[in-house]
Amino acid sequence: MMHTTSTPACLVVAAVALIALADATPAAAQGNIWTFEDLPYYEALKADPRAARMTLIVPAWSKEFPHSFEPGNRFVWQITVGRELPILGFRSQRDDGRAGNKEWGAGLWIPVSFHVIEDFKDESAPIVDTDYRFGFMTKFQYGLTEESWLGIRLVPWAHESTHLGDEYVIIAQRPREGRLPFERVNPSFEYLEYGVSYERLFGEAMLTLRHGGIRLHGDDGYYSDHLLGSDEPTLTPSEKNFEPSFGVEWRGWQRGERDLFVSVDMRHKLAYKFHRAPGEEETKHWSFSVAIGRTVPERTSGVPLRDYFVYVYRGVNPFGQLREQKDYWFAGFGWTFGI
């Protein structure tokens, strides 16, 4: 579903106008305006499961999916292809790194990402789910001291769409004892997301503390009130449409040319309940992502492999329609690529 809103159009017009202003500003006055520079104002945590970046998790293992035919845990892999595209912004100090003491910087980014997970246990190794997201993002960073920073991130509008794979759906439609008939639902929604960050240096190590949240636009919830291909309202819309999150990351202990890191992301996620009896409450559950590995130092360029790590997820299944699965786990080895 796509909710009508003028926010994206206004942001596009503002971005074009600011780029034109930057091009028309005399060179001596352009020190505080930047365009298409990837500045480190609010970098996603390594454990953030929704980050727009290039990440491959393989080899990996997963709990059985809700509609899998072959029972038991399975070998899987998942890939995220994405990027936060920097457009333009302002800064009080001409510096290509973090904001200095009592200095600030702000800008506009366009986050775009595409995610796929594949199951190798069921017949034909089906694509289980594909998700994509795009939107508009503003970031702000203020230097509290020479060694600490306040960061703010706001996504005023973004769209997320999720789709089960065709072969997964074919397998899900097979009858299996003790399982209800399969129904295909494609969650699709628009949302606002905010984040607040505190970062502090301890020698050469960096501690990051985060809080954020996602709230849906409109009253439709995460999915329509009807099945795909039908107009009959047979589904109960979601109502608990706010998802808070907390995160912490420690990055330091440099060994060779890379830093060690430990990153944790926690989200209070809604478990979908497509058919609820009158008065029946939806349930939310804490879901955890943990990443432990090594990464290149901040502002490093020309190194294709940015991170490698062990990744573990436990909680509500995060993949589209499969969020009806409350107790899900996934674990594997992750590899993040960049330039």
Residue ranges of each PLM-predicted region?
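N-terminal signal peptide c-region/cleavage motif recognized by signal peptidases
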Residues: 22-24
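Transmembrane beta-barrel domains of Gram-negative outer membranes and organellar outer membranes
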Residues: 30-142, 180
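Short loop/turn motifs that connect adjacent beta-strands in outer-membrane beta-barrel proteins
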Residues: 42-45, 87-108, 144-150, 199-208, ...
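Outer membrane beta-barrel transmembrane domains
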Residues: 215-339
